[in-house]
Amino acid sequence: MKFIGIIPARYASTRFPGKPLAILGGKPMIQRVYERASLALEEVWVATDDTRIADAVKAFGGNVVMTSAAHRSGTDRCLEAYRNIGSDADVVINIQGDEPFIDPLQLKQIQSCFDDPDTRIATLVRPYNPEGGIEGLENPNSPKVALDAEGYALLFSRSVIPYLRGVERREWPSRHQYYTHIGMYAYRAGTLAEITALPQLSLIHI
């Protein structure tokens, strides 16, 4: 099975414009992400709509493909990149462009999900450490995931899920195993095309 890693990278972030080019230890952030991803994947590309990012990737010898500036999400950008590259990879891994310390082992783990021929989409979670307390659990920058008994994701939320009725809120982390999301998704190529064609629900913008 063939995998391709695609790193969607935008310059015009509302919270941190130019984030992919922020210098970390003498290298642009996008280079840090690219190099870490390359430790686990034979083929990695940066997908961007900005020539400044494209030039930075070319400068360190990375693969880069230009995409439209009109995409609704990084997922849509990944699909266009996959098509523009002319890739024949079976699985596309969407790698966040602001994760300079991404663990190559996690990339290997998400690839292993596709050992099951029925897997169409995969993502990763980590058990929440109760020592972080309720304050850490409530951090909206750390999305939570509710899982079923077989480990399938039921719901993603920036709020704490599930709600523990009848339990003091500060006790929640020690009374239930919560999970937080690791921002990485992998899709079989056909499934990626299918989901990007679906209309977005209003909930995604909340």
What are these model-predicted stretches?
Residues 204-206:
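Conserved small/polar residues in nucleotide/adenosyl-binding loops
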